[in-house]
Amino acid sequence: MAKPDKVDAVTEIAERFNTSTAAVVTEYRGLSMAKLVQLRRALGEGTTYRVAKNTLVKRAAEQSGVEGLDELFVGPTAIAFIEGEPVDAAKALKEFAKDNKALVIKGGYMDGRPISVSEVESIADLDSREVTLGKLAGAMKAKMNQAAALFAAPATKAARLAAALQEKREGGESDAS
């Protein structure tokens, strides 16, 4: 008979798997509670960092239909459940792991499939959504400015031509006199 607290834990983890856009599995062996708190703060509001027993996580993953992660659930396991954009959380995990060698990124789950450590790091290397939108807006503005200059060029050219003809006529009339 399963204990109610374990059933609740499995249900909670399964729900997190279902509601998260991504999950990153880590090993936290050797991290102090203070470091774990620091990591949770670095991850931000959209990410929940949950330490759990491997057997409970395996059951929750199975219950959620998450496959391909069983080999990651070895040793002290904690999972970062990411709701929203995974880039910022992946960056925070990568930076924290760089500064704290005790945190090891094992892999993750995103878009219905397992992802490797290198894929998590690739996600961390991407620009955030806001930065990408800013770059796109800048590129669009530059193209609009180019288009405006292109459309204004014939009118400017015609005005210069008219001014040159006017000067030529005025110069020609003064020579004829």
Swiss-Prot record:
Keyword check for Amino-acid biosynthesis: no
Alphabetical UniProt keywords: Ribonucleoprotein, Ribosomal protein, RNA-binding, rRNA-binding
SUPFAM superfamilies from the UniProt entry: Ribosomal protein L10-like
Cellular-component GO terms for this entry: ribonucleoprotein complex; ribosome
GO-annotated biological processes: translation
Record InterPro entries: Ribosomal_uL10, Ribosomal_uL10-like_sf, Ribosomal_uL10_bac, Ribosomal_uL10_bac_type
Coiled-coil annotated spans: none
UniProt entry tagged with the keyword Ribosomal protein: yes
A Gene Ontology molecular function term of the record: large ribosomal subunit rRNA binding
Function summary: Forms part of the ribosomal stalk, playing a central role in the interaction of the ribosome with GTP-bound translation factors.
Family stated for the protein in its record: Belongs to the universal ribosomal protein uL10 family.
Subunit description: Part of the ribosomal stalk of the 50S ribosomal subunit. The N-terminus interacts with L11 and the large rRNA to form the base of the stalk. The C-terminus forms an elongated spine to which L12 dimers bind in a sequential fashion forming a multimeric L10(L12)X complex.
Name of this protein: Large ribosomal subunit protein uL10
Organism of derivation: Saccharopolyspora erythraea (strain ATCC 11635 / DSM 40517 / JCM 4748 / NBRC 13426 / NCIMB 8594 / NRRL 2338)
Lineage of the species this protein comes from: Bacteria, Bacillati, Actinomycetota, Actinomycetes, Pseudonocardiales
Gene designation per UniProt: rplJ
